[in-house]
Amino acid sequence: MTGLEILPAVDVAGGQAVRLVQGAAGTETRYGSPLEAALAWQAAGARWIHLVDLDAAFGRGSNRELLAEIVARVDVAVELSGGIRDDESLRVALATGCARVNIGTAALENPEWVRRVVAEYGEKIAVGLDVRDGRLAARGWTKDGGELFEVLARLDADGCARYVVTDVARDGTLGGPNIELLRAVCAATDRPVVASGGISSLDDVRAVAALVPLGVEGLIIGKALYAGVFSLREAMTAAQA
């Protein structure tokens, strides 16, 4: 199938499905059971789910058993993210049977390790590029991780298969996607890009879908779906427009 793949987000904190504003701890809006959310997105037609352990991302705990249960219970592909920074956390994540993992902070803080795991696992590894004003954010978006395009060039050279690009300032705000950022990343790499952050309307979905020829293959949507701005089915239809 051509077109843009929609990945509904299920972010987990304290065992609950939540959404944050600009990735900031303490801004959570709770949406109940993450397993029920994941099963609901599957029932609505999702082919992928973006599943995040926010507690692990912020270094304040883990929901690993719950995430493993969710991956086991759904029949769709899962992209697993949050706190995957070393061999043990990567082993646990891959052992869930997820389709791929998204590595964020470690790609900035431990480039030698990322080079090794990318070489070993290939398509199973995506690297999250969380961007604020042209700089990369690390450790749950609270620390600076360096200049975006310098890091991107290094990751490309290391053979990274895919990038998940988030504009931190827009995530969870319904403020619209950063199309310029996505264009710039696509121009700088020939690897596929999954976009994330700020989707507020079906027009936003169509705007990102227009970037498919440039290299954008997927779009993560969270708050707009949970807030009922549009349905997953409507988003999937807009993504093929």
Swiss-Prot record:
Alphabetized GO MF terms: 1-(5-phosphoribosyl)-5-[(5-phosphoribosylamino)methylideneamino]imidazole-4-carboxamide isomerase activity; phosphoribosylanthranilate isomerase activity
Gene3D superfamilies registered for this protein in UniProt: Aldolase class I
GO biological process: L-histidine biosynthetic process; L-tryptophan biosynthetic process
Classification via SUPFAM superfamilies: Ribulose-phoshate binding barrel
Keywords assigned by UniProt, alphabetized: Amino-acid biosynthesis, Cytoplasm, Histidine biosynthesis, Isomerase
GO CC terms: cytoplasm
Pathway: Amino-acid biosynthesis; L-histidine biosynthesis; L-histidine from 5-phospho-alpha-D-ribose 1-diphosphate: step 4/9
Enzymatic class: isomerase
InterPro entries: Aldolase_TIM, His_biosynth, HisA/PriA_Actinobacteria, Isoase_HisA-like, Isoase_HisA-like_bact, RibuloseP-bd_barrel
Subcellular location: Cytoplasm
Active-site residues from the entry: 11, 130
EC number(s) recorded for this UniProt protein: 5.3.1.16
Catalytic activity: 1-(5-phospho-beta-D-ribosyl)-5-[(5-phospho-beta-D-ribosylamino)methylideneamino]imidazole-4-carboxamide = 5-[(5-phospho-1-deoxy-D-ribulos-1-ylimino)methylamino]-1-(5-phospho-beta-D-ribosyl)imidazole-4-carboxamide
One Pfam family per UniProt: His_biosynth
Family according to the record: Belongs to the HisA/HisF family.
Protein name in UniProt: 1-(5-phosphoribosyl)-5-[(5-phosphoribosylamino)methylideneamino] imidazole-4-carboxamide isomerase
